Amino acid sequence: MDEGSRGWILGSYSSYEPRALKRATPWVTYTIIVVNVVVYLITSAPSGFIAISSWWVEVGGFAPILLVVDSVNIYRFFTSMFLHGDIFHIFFNMYFLYLFGRGVEGALGSKRYLILYLLSGIGAAIFHTAYSYLLGGARALMVPAIGASGAISGVLGAYLILYPGTKLTACTWFILPVCFTLYSAYFLLLWFAFQVFYGYTSVGAGIAFMAHAGGFVAGIALLGLLADRHRIRLLRALSGGGSLFGFIRYVFGSVQQREGLSIGVKVAVALLIFLLSAGALAGTFYSMEYQATFDVAKISVSKDGDYSVGYVFYQWRHMRPILLGRDLVDPNVRVLLNRLYAAGLLYEPGYSGKQIRIVGEMLHGVIPVCGTEVAIVIYIDEFIGTYDERGLLVEGRGTIRSPIINVIERPFFCSYEITDDIYRFDFSLTTYMGVNPAPLALEFSVVSLLLSLVSLYIVLWRDKELVITPVGASTVGSEGFVPL
């Protein structure tokens, strides 16, 4: 395939008229923003557009363990990129995409840019999985991750290599707002360093820092594979007098132009990527050594018409199942699990190898709350369950009714009250046996290592051929304001 046909397939403008290239509209960036906003409006409507509904997180979020449970969950690589937790989450993600995405799309062309965006999101999920297993163990793979941050981080990584010489106005707040201007290379280096530092030190913080770092690395690696060098050279020449795409403006003065990244930035970025590479290598060996097998239960429940789905995990100790992950699921799923457990329907050695049916019975159980055991009544309208040879429920469905315990927890204080209302739960449960996440973590650790090494190669030896606006350019301005 010749150069021209390859450029046509991926949207290269190498043979296009220069002025059209210079003024190209970033339609993919705008479209991604619109799609994300529309999805957010749909998924957050039940909360008045303040935060996403938990049901969408359960069905569309990326929980790595679910790839092991059922390969059909591969769709979560993509759906998770378009889900956002709350209004601030989507606002800042879309703002950063708008700020940095337009220039990267202009440099790559729309089709190549879309490929980089989507593959960076997948790369971010791969890093997230590998480092979650290394730093947090198998339980960390149960937590669903959502957001476009990983894909956008790939755009930031590409922007660092393409436009290190653009200037951004950054603002932070210390009593009063303090604003200053700096090269994008320095801002992105600082941002990347924060992700790596907090990724290693803030496990379980509720933010997928390693997904951000992994997306950034994937973006650099993919840029080296997707960039049309012919197009880059043309844009580099066009940047010498005027503006690019209507929002990046330059004047080349007497300052001597330096190609590629500055030595300091290059060394710092390379060091950070090396730290990620070391972690990926450690994750490779850790995944080979540490094997943990779980039984995974998928629960679908409707509480008075409010539908939820969730996953919990059993780990066997001393011949009894320890239920993990109840604190990570939707409240309706958690309440149902507590009732089934209290009623002796999740695990009962006396039911080993049997199928049972219960209709119209009232059972009593206890639930641990605030350091004590609270008696609760459970009405079994209907229950059909199949148990394995250990007495673990592997298939179950039915309808139960029960009051709810409202718990109030504060520092040094815990109280509860049992509601007078009785709530109905219609549910189904399926248990997947012998789930081992170590092979998945091993594969993803190897991929993370390879992406890190490729990006390291790009930063150290290929940045000069990919740069469009080096630091040596005197930047008149670029439409960029970033919060710190």
What are these regions (language model features)?
Residues 287-361:
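Membrane-interface segments at or immediately adjacent to transmembrane helices
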Residues 362-406:
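A cross-kingdom signal targeting lumenal/periplasmic-facing segments of multi-pass membrane
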Residues 391-432:
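Extended, hydrophilic extramembrane loops/domains of integral membrane proteins
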Residues 2-308, 312-317, 424-463:
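A detector for small-residue-rich transmembrane helices and their helix-helix packing motifs
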Residues 338-341, 346-359, 364, 368-371, ...:
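N-terminal leader/transit sequences and adjacent low-complexity N-terminal tails
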Residues 266, 289-300, 360, 366, ...:
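Non-catalytic terminal regions of proteins
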Residues 450-484:
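Juxtamembrane interface at the cytosolic side of transmembrane helices
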